[in-house]
């Protein structure tokens, strides 16, 4: 089965089938809001490539994200195979959480590299030791992302240690995270690790949290011109 993430057209079609609303993405999130989420993702997750390079000893490339609207049911229908779900909760600066989803086979490559291998020993189960190795990589990655986000939003932001869970979309639900038919935001990134991994990761978040992030960015944008005007006024005096 093709493991590429959903295209915009596929998501729109699936969303239309689920709730009977055409152009659902524009209704739920405006183009400006999606652009803002893309900018946030690009600066926060995108800049963590340097951190991963240090950990994995391979060149890491994370591309500009694609922001789309989907549901868990839609994802389950398209990707009936194992993933590792990485839950990240904000403990300071922001209120909420999001879920990073990586394919299990990609997690095995990361685990092998973290444990000193060359990334090819992937015909193994993700036992506690390997899951811990993946967790450390995700902790460093999301910590770097939080630092970048803190700089971007000009406020202190802290996160809790990521919690990892193995999820098989063919048989499991994301109970405790999202409802099966809940409309959510999917911020997807293409990630390359040397010649070993050419895949994608998904950052899933509730609509409310996505809008919450955008509001923080908008508030910052509105504050900056006001501060500049005050400085100009003081200079003229």
PLM segments and residue spans:
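Composition-driven recognition of glycine/serine/threonine/acidic- and proline-rich low-complexity segments
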Residues: 2-12, 16-17, 26, 30, ...
């Amino acid at each position: 089965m093709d493991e590429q993430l959903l295209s915009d057209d596929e998501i729109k079609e699936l969303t239309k089938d689920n709730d009977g609303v055409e152009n659902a993405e524009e209704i739920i999130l405006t183009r400006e809001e999606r652009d803002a989420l893309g900018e946030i993702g690009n600066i926060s997750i995108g800049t963590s490539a340097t951190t991963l390079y240090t950990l994995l000893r391979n060149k890491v490339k994370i591309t500009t994200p694609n922001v789309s609207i989907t549901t868990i049911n839609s994802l389950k229908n398209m990707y009936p195979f194992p993933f590792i779900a990485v839950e990240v909760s904000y403990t300071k600066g922001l209120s909420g959480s999001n879920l990073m989803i990586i394919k299990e086979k990609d997690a095995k490559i990361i685990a092998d590299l973290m444990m000193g291998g060359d990334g090819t020993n992937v015909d193994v189960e993700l036992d506690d030791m390997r899951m811990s190795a993946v967790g450390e990589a995700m902790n460093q990655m999301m910590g770097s992302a939080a630092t970048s986000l803190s700089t971007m939003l000009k406020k202190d932001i802290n996160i809790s240690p990521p919690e990892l869970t193995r999820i098989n979309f063919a048989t499991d639900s994301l109970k405790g995270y999202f409802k099966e038919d809940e409309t959510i935001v999917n911020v997807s990134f293409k990630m390359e690790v040397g010649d070993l991994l050419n895949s994608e990761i998904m950052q899933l978040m509730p609509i409310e949290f996505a809008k919450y992030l955008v509001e923080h960015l908008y508030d910052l944008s509105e504050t900056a011109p006001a501060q500049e005007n005050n400085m100009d006024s003081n200079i003229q005096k």
